[in-house]
Amino acid sequence: MKTGIKKVKLHVKKNDSVVVISGNDKGKAGKVLRVYPQKGRVIIEGVNIRKRHMKPTQSHPQGSIIEREFPIHASNVKKS
């Protein structure tokens, strides 16, 4: 019986410049910030921006809403 998740070999690496070829952000270009080989996903600078609601902390007693990049599947990008 196998355990764990198999790593997928990806065609992009950190700091590669890529273009999104499908999805809502089609045509946008950016630099790869992080790669998740277990999930086959990458985070690209300035692409797939979503709002994240943060809990209140001592530094931000009201809580906050921040915008950050979320991962997209590596098959939706190509090197440029």
Curated annotation (Swiss-Prot):
Any single GO CC term annotated in Swiss-Prot or TrEMBL for this entry: ribonucleoprotein complex
Annotated region (Disordered), positions in chain: 53-80
Source species taxonomy: Bacteria, Pseudomonadati, Chlorobiota, Chlorobiia, Chlorobiales
Transmembrane segments: none
Designated name of the protein: Large ribosomal subunit protein uL24
Coiled coil residues, start to end: none
Keyword list, A-Z: Ribonucleoprotein, Ribosomal protein, RNA-binding, rRNA-binding
GO molecular function: rRNA binding; structural constituent of ribosome
Subunit structure: Part of the 50S ribosomal subunit.
Family: Belongs to the universal ribosomal protein uL24 family.
Gene3D superfamilies documented for this protein: 2.30.30.30
